[in-house]
């Protein structure tokens, strides 16, 4: 927890720009088919009301993953304050085999102790499966809740939790001198802050694999340019500003390279920069348009969008040479892919029958599953553990962010109150 807090501390420098008009998760479709679990409100050991609903944060995180269906608080058979008070039979009668309980205690120095216990109410009734405690200041209470969620999630699924991650996105606000803003928030929309404001459009933010930098497209020089901004100090490095289009940046998983699309020779083509030396090499060529690169885990292969066959489809190419290979065959067109960190699947924008939705493709079998049901879906970005996707869609006259689990069980919106929201990018583990 202490190391995780040190990593996250760099963001505090930017929190002077925290906004009041934040995005928040609004549930559209529940997870009745998820694993039932009990999450009890954490016991508050101080005066008045608790400063944060940690139990609510844990329940929301588990629900958002699509893998769990936390029991509504009104249906909880009991509200134990500790593992010893859990009555396994009361929970197992409701089909629940695991319960999360916890405690929040104020300290004289103004900090708080947050503790949780994950209790087995099925196979080995009363056994504590996982537990931990954290000492945090008030502004880190939500982070402590997400930490508990990560640990509970991993214990029960074997998958590393991704609830302490963040998302970057672009907001086009309703007027003002700087109507375009690149913002970052917790994955669930809380603790939002501004990274960069501009009078000109901002596009396509992409995280470095260590979470310390964002690459994005800006038009402040009068034409498109690719820049990399360090979040801790705001330092900006210009990467590319060639004639015509400069766009679609993507850091390699090993952090050594940046892929992007340029049209300096006419058609859009893919290029890769070695970030240490600044040297750029061309990966694709020809008259077709090639863009929207995303890396495979080996940092040697890219998936990308090309109109080589007429309509946009997703292809794979090795950055060291070789002919591109088409990897999407279902639907009239497929584009803007994001490959999972294990390389087993990708999500993409898939169009068929006049509909444009987010779909998931198994890269071994080629099987495709449509995940979303919103309108004109765009720019999907995977959580680092591959369980959730953030994307933008059209709603009314604007754009909003949406969340869908990669098993399709859970769907939610993250509506903003002060503008259109586009180009979401999910951070790595932080």
Curated annotation (Swiss-Prot):
<dbReference type="InterPro" id="IPR014167">
    <property type="entry name" value="Tol-Pal_TolB"/>
</dbReference>
<dbReference type="Pfam" id="PF07676">
    <property type="entry name" value="PD40"/>
</dbReference>
<protein>
    <recommendedName>
        <fullName>Tol-Pal system protein TolB</fullName>
    </recommendedName>
</protein>
<comment type="function">
    <text>Part of the Tol-Pal system, which plays a role in outer membrane invagination during cell division and is important for maintaining outer membrane integrity. TolB occupies a key intermediary position in the Tol-Pal system because it communicates directly with both membrane-embedded components, Pal in the outer membrane and TolA in the inner membrane.</text>
</comment>
<keyword id="KW-0131">Cell cycle</keyword>
<dbReference type="GO" id="GO:0051301">
    <property type="term" value="P:cell division"/>
</dbReference>
<feature type="signal peptide">
    <location>
        <begin position="1"/>
        <end position="21"/>
    </location>
</feature>
<dbReference type="InterPro" id="IPR011659">
    <property type="entry name" value="PD40"/>
</dbReference>
<dbReference type="Pfam" id="PF04052">
    <property type="entry name" value="TolB_N"/>
</dbReference>
<comment type="similarity">
    <text>Belongs to the TolB family.</text>
</comment>
<dbReference type="GO" id="GO:0042597">
    <property type="term" value="C:periplasmic space"/>
</dbReference>
<dbReference type="GO" id="GO:0017038">
    <property type="term" value="P:protein import"/>
</dbReference>
<dbReference type="InterPro" id="IPR011042">
    <property type="entry name" value="6-blade_b-propeller_TolB-like"/>
</dbReference>
<keyword id="KW-0574">Periplasm</keyword>
<comment type="subunit">
    <text>The Tol-Pal system is composed of five core proteins: the inner membrane proteins TolA, TolQ and TolR, the periplasmic protein TolB and the outer membrane protein Pal. They form a network linking the inner and outer membranes and the peptidoglycan layer.</text>
</comment>
<keyword id="KW-0732">Signal</keyword>
<keyword id="KW-0132">Cell division</keyword>
<dbReference type="InterPro" id="IPR007195">
    <property type="entry name" value="TolB_N"/>
</dbReference>
């Amino acid at each position: 927890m202490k190391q995780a807090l040190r990593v996250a501390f760099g963001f505090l420098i930017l929190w002077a720009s925290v906004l009041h008009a934040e995005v928040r998760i609004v549930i559209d479709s529940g997870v009745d088919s998820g694993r039932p679990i009990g999450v009890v409100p954490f016991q508050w050991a101080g005066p008045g009301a608790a400063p944060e609903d940690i139990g609510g944060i844990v329940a929301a995180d588990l629900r958002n993953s699509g893998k769990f269906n936390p029991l509504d608080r009104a249906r909880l058979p009991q509200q134990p304050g500790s593992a010893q008070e859990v009555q396994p039979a009361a929970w197992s009668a409701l089909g629940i085999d695991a319960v999360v309980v916890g405690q929040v205690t104020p300290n004289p120095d103004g900090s708080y102790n947050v503790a949780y216990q994950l209790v087995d109410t099925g196979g080995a009734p009363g056994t504590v499966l996982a537990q931990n405690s954290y000492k945090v200041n008030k502004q880190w209470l939500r982070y402590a809740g997400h930490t508990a969620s990560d640990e509970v999630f991993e214990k029960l699924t074997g998958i590393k939790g991704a609830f302490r991650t963040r998302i970057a996105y672009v907001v086009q606000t309703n007027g003002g001198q700087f109507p375009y803003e690149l913002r970052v928030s917790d994955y669930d929309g809380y603790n939002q802050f501004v990274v960069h404001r501009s009078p000109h459009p901002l596009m396509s933010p992409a995280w470095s694999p260590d979470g310390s930098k964002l690459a994005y497209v800006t038009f402040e020089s009068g034409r498109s340019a690719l820049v990399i901004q360090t979040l801790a100090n705001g330092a900006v490095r210009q990467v590319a500003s060639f004639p015509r289009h400069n766009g679609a940046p993507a850091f390699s998983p090993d952090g050594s390279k940046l892929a992007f699309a340029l049209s300096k020779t006419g058609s859009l083509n893919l290029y890769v920069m070695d970030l240490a030396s600044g040297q750029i090499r061309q990966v694709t060529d020809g008259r077709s348009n090639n863009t929207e690169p995303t890396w495979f885990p080996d940092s040697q292969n890219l998936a990308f969008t090309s109109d080589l066959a007429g309509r946009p489809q997703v292809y794979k190419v090795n950055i060291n040479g070789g002919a591109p290979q088409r990897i999407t065959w279902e639907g009239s067109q497929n584009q803007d892919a994001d490959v999972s960190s294990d390389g087993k699947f990708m999500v993409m924008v898939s169009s068929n029958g006049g509909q444009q939705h987010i779909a998931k493709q198994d890269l071994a079998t080629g099987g495709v599953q449509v995940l979303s049901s919103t309108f004109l879906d765009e720019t999907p970005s995977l959580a680092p553990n591959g369980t959730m996707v953030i994307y933008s869609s059209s709603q009314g006259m604007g754009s909003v962010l949406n969340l869908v689990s990669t098993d399709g069980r859970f769907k939610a919106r993250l509506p903003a109150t002060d503008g259109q929201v586009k180009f979401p990018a999910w951070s790595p583990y932080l």
